A protein has these predicted regions:
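Short acidic capping loops at alpha-helix termini that bridge into adjacent secondary structure
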Residues: 36-40, 123-127, 155-159
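Acidic, Mg2+-coordinating phosphoryl-transfer loop and its flanking beta/alpha structural elements
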Residues: 159-198
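Structural recognition of alpha->loop->beta junctions
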Residues: 120-130, 190-207
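N-terminal helical cap/lid subdomain that shapes the substrate entry/recognition surface
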Residues: 2-89, 93-97
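Substrate-recognition/cap helix-loop segment adjacent to the acidic, metal-dependent catalytic center
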Residues: 29-31, 51-59, 80, 88, ...
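Conserved Lys-Pro-Asp/Glu-containing loop-to-beta segment of HAD-superfamily phosphomonoesterases
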Residues: 4, 138-168
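Non-catalytic pre-domain segments flanking phosphatase-related domains
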Residues: 1-7, 157, 213-217
Length: 217
């Protein structure tokens, strides 16, 4: 029985895809580095900002790139992010059913809170684990285990919901069932290769998982 659901943020419950892609393109251009296509950027999304910028630039020290990224990201945050269908109504219903909820993300806390507040989702979250709250981010199990410890819940009665490969890997390493979202830019076929316990095509599919533990496919 699922008693707690942990959500990734970007690309899972808040549509930050265009903001993230635009921020990377800006950072590379501003620092006179070769440009990348969306298709080159998307596979890396979900890992830490440093890891992504290092992969894109070949640089170990990405501090200047991170500054460019965050500057663009903050400036264009509200205009470039959006919501996914039925997220709010699903959160409200899960809360009504007594399901506890939290966030596990590789974002920093300020932008995490900003996005949650913008879409009125913060009120549902009992714990928020960001990249600065852990020593080892996803795909390591530490972020998921930190959230579980904060909530004092059983890993086997917890569900992780995410849009990226590292979400699946982190949850599995923590001994937590995981649902991958079919609206991920990575593509459902790619996510299936990493064997999530569930694939959901609509946020309301979580009702059935909570009720029966029946796989959605």
């Amino acid at each position: 029985m699922i008693e707690c659901i942990l959500f990734d943020l970007d690309g899972t419950i808040v549509n930050t895809n265009e903001l993230i892609i635009g921020s990377f393109m800006h950072a590379l251009k501003e620092n006179n580095l070769p440009s990348l296509t969306r298709e080159q950027i998307i596979p890396h999304m979900g890992t830490t900002l440093h890891q992504q910028l290092s992969a894109f630039s070949g640089l170990e020290d990405t501090s200047v790139l991170e500054k460019s990224y965050r500057s663009y990201n903050y400036a264009h945050h509200d205009e470039l992010i959006g919501s996914f269908p039925r997220v709010n109504e699903t959160m409200e219903e899960l809360s009504r059913r007594g399901i506890r909820m939290g966030i596990v993300t590789t974002k920093i806390r300020p932008t995490t809170l900003k996005a949650l507040e913008m879409f009125d989702l913060l009120k549902y979250m009992e714990t928020i684990v960001t990249v600065t709250d852990v020593t080892q981010p996803k795909p390591h199990p530490e972020p998921v285990l930190t959230a579980i410890r904060n909530l004092e819940v059983d890993p086997q009665h917890t569900l992780m919901v995410g849009d990226s490969i590292v979400d699946i890997q982190s949850a599995k390493a923590a001994g937590v069932p995981v649902a991958a979202v079919a609206w991920s830019l990575k593509g459902e076929e790619t996510l299936r290769k990493y064997e999530p316990d569930y694939i959901i095509h609509d946020m309301t599919d979580l009702y059935e998982i909570v009720r029966q533990g029946t796989k959605e496919s």
